[in-house]
């Protein structure tokens, strides 16, 4: 395709050397013209625009109607054709054609071609003569010279014109064009070298990035993460560690998703301590543990006398975390009115204390966490969509323990080491004990595994923990209702869920799962042992487990059980469950 420079691509102003009268070539004008051309070629810019500007300047001191620069690749295929002398309104048929036969002869021979009348020359085909507008009544002269890079012909520089003067003028212009072609050749060489270097740089960059991804985080960074308390080498955890290393390098807001007990606070702290904010404060707050009025004061602070009991001014968590990281756990539990207040702080990084009109600006990185399905909450208008998008800039899904079983022995030994250190014991884990742990689903994830190890170690009378020491081997493990309930084993906190219609809510006794052990095949209890004594016991344990998981917040427990808060309150009274106060 022929490139015709638009008005925006043409130089704003070029000095126009004095043109010699026909037949009287001026050395001064030629030298001035070549000097100006060299300045154009040395200026940065796209090659096709640069060549078009060269041809435009060439018109000012060489008699020509049209000028062409044709470049070819290593296979001899036309790579770029730049033209001058055609108006933008010229018939496309002429603007996109070149005298092919003549150009091929120049490339093949590597010599200049000078013709006083193309109509009388066999080097020009009928198509070439038509392109140049030559006929028996209109003679057209043609000059073409090769463009070389080193010793290789890479293109041609050609002009045509209505002949005026003697043939010596053709020879003079041919020598002049040869000098211009030589300068163009040097420019093309530099452009190709630069393009080759840039392409190689991109290839090297892609290769290095791929190696970085394949190798994962450097050993030093992995060791640092292990020091933060993240233990394991399973594929699922390794993938998470790689993301933690990458995320820690930025200041983006992070949303940690995952079931309860998967270590969201531990991951948040690891991100903070691996970031440039590591020496700044790491402040945490459980949003579900406080009423809305207290939550606002905790996050934003308050002035003296702002409310009853505010005997002095107090900084909020945002102020305390300035230049550091604020970890907001259970963010899915905050009310819609408070969501709007939090959104403003996340967007503007500014707020007012309770009881004050003074705006405080902070620099805080927020890491939020939830085990709730926020997509479902947004669909039900329980969670603001704009806040969802604000906190979910970089979502990280923490794998449940059942998806990283190879980490169970490492975690169990670490928890036992911690227990021994705190209690002056020297217990060990037998192989049979590891087999028991590996067969369990652990719906409470790492937290449940830690509790299991601590409980078993506390009750162990020997010097080592064996299979029979575990509660599940004695028919006393009641985690089965947790695993079978809707909120465990069936729910992916990272995937959207369908809303539960009110008519689908069924009383507890009708939804209780059949009693069975949490452990996988290979019964741990003696034959005939009753693990759960009837549906009533299972119902009570389901309610207790849901209340404990929700921090004894009835509304949250109701969501876990698929019931209404009123039904949960009835179940608490029915089974005589005492509500724990914090």
From Swiss-Prot:
One of its GO terms (biological process) is positive regulation of DNA-templated transcription. One of its GO terms (molecular function) is cis-regulatory region sequence-specific DNA binding. Residues 554-573 bind DNA. Residues 230-458 form the Sigma-54 factor interaction domain. The keyword ATP-binding applies. Residues 46-188 form the GAF domain. Residues 540-582 are annotated as: C-terminal DNA-binding domain. A divalent metal cation binds at residues 472, 477. Signal peptide: none annotated. Residues 16-27 have a biased composition (Basic and acidic residues). Interacts with sigma-54. This is Nif-specific regulatory protein. The lineage of its organism: Bacteria, Pseudomonadati, Pseudomonadota, Alphaproteobacteria, Hyphomicrobiales.
């Amino acid at each position: 395709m022929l490139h015709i420079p638009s008005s925006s691509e043409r130089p704003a102003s070029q000095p126009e050397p004095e043109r010699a009268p026909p037949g009287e070539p001026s050395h001064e004008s030629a030298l001035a013209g070549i000097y100006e051309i060299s300045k154009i070629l040395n200026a940065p810019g796209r090659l096709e625009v640069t060549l078009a500007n060269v041809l435009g300047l060439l018109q000012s001191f060489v008699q020509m109607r049209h000028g062409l620069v044709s470049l070819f690749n290593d296979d001899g295929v036309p790579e770029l054709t730049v033209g001058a002398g055609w108006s933008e309104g010229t018939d496309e048929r002429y603007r996109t054609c070149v005298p092919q036969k003549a150009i091929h002869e120049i490339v093949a021979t590597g010599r200049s071609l000078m013709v006083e009348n193309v109509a009388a020359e066999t080097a020009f085909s009928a198509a070439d003569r038509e392109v140049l507008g030559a006929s028996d009544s209109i003679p057209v002269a043609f000059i073409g010279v090769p463009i070389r890079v080193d010793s290789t012909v890479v293109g041609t520089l050609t002009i045509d014109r209505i002949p005026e003067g003697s043939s010596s003028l053709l020879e003079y212009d041919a020598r002049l064009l040869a000098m211009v072609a030589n300068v163009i050749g040097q420019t093309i060489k530099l452009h190709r070298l630069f393009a080759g270097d840039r392409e190689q740089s991109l290839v090297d960059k892609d290769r290095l990035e791929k190696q970085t991804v394949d190798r994962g985080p450097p050993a030093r960074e992995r060791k640092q993460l292990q020091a933060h308390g993240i233990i394991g080498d399973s594929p699922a955890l390794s993938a998470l560690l790689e993301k933690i290393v990458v995320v820690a390098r930025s200041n983006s807001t992070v949303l940690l998703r995952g079931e309860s007990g998967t270590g969201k606070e531990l991951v948040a702290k690891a991100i903070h301590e691996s970031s440039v904010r590591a020496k700044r404060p790491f402040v945490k707050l459980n949003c579900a543990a406080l009423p809305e009025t207290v939550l606002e004061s905790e996050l934003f602070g308050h002035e003296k006398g702002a409310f009853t009991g505010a005997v002095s001014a107090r900084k909020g968590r945002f102020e305390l975390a300035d230049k550091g990281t604020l970890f907001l756990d259970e963010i899915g539990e905050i009310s819609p009115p408070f969501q709007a207040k939090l959104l403003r702080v996340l967007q503007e990084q500014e707020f007012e204390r309770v009881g004050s009109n003074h705006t405080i600006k902070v620099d805080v990185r927020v890491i939020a966490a939830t085990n709730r399905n926020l997509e479902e909450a947004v669909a039900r208008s329980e969670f603001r969509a704009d806040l969802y998008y604000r906190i979910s800039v970089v979502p990280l899904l923490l794998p449940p323990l059942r998806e990283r079983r190879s980490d169970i022995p490492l975690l169990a030994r670490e928890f036992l080491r911690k227990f021994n250190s705190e209690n002056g014991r020297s217990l060990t884990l037998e192989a049979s004990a590891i087999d028991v742990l590996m067969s369990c689903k652990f719906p409470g994830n790492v937290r449940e595994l830690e509790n299991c190890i601590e409980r078993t170690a506390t009750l162990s009378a020997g010097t080592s923990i064996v299979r029979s020491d575990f509660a599940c081997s004695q028919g006393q493990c009641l985690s089965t209702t947790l695993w079978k309930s809707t909120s465990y084993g069936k729910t992916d906190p990272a995937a959207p869920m369908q809303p539960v219609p009110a008519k689908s809510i069924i009383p507890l006794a009708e939804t209780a799962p059949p009693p069975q052990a949490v452990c996988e095949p290979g019964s741990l209890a003696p034959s005939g042992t009753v693990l759960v004594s009837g549906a009533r016991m299972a119902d009570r344990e389901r309610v207790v487990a849901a209340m404990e998981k929700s921090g004894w917040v009835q509304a949250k427990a109701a969501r876990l059980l698929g019931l209404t808060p009123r039904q949960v309150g009835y179940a608490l009274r029915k089974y005589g469950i005492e509500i724990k106060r914090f």
